[in-house]
């Protein structure tokens, strides 16, 4: 399948720590569902995809960007894909070109809401 569904909750947790992207897919979609009840201003979640080595800097720059920008710096070329920030009961998805992922590179997905990225994160890898 060329998509995955991820859930985030009010306890600052994703329900998965790793995503494998089938390298035969042209595009890959991440579907995010917030299973909690808290509003996005208090406990918002998104999914940001970047190289593992860029994760910390992308999250730090994202904090400065604010909620109106989904805690992602505008035009950040280190960001491969990201969803909007959503609150409890909401869903969002993002589709990206699989050619942006290179074999042998380490990729991460994380929530860039302030204070979340150190806990709400996992790995993304190309697989078959």
From Swiss-Prot:
Disulfide bonds join 2-25. Transmembrane segments: none annotated. GO terms for molecular function: copper ion binding; electron transfer activity. Residues 1-128 form the Plastocyanin-like domain. GO terms for cellular component: periplasmic space. InterPro entries: Azurin, BlueCu_1, BlueCu_1_BS, Cu-binding_ET, Cupredoxin. Pfam families: Copper-bind. Keywords: Copper, Disulfide bond, Electron transport, Metal-binding, Periplasm, Transport. It is found in: Periplasm. The keyword Transferase does not apply. Its cofactor is Cu cation. The keyword rRNA-binding does not apply. Cu cation binds at residues 45, 111, 116, 120. Binds 1 copper ion per subunit. Transfers electrons from cytochrome c551 to cytochrome oxidase. Transfers electrons from the tryptophan tryptophylquinone of the aromatic amine dehydrogenase heterotetramer. NCBIfam families: azurin (TIGR02695). Monomer. Interacts with the AAUA/AAUB heterotetramer complex. This is Azurin.
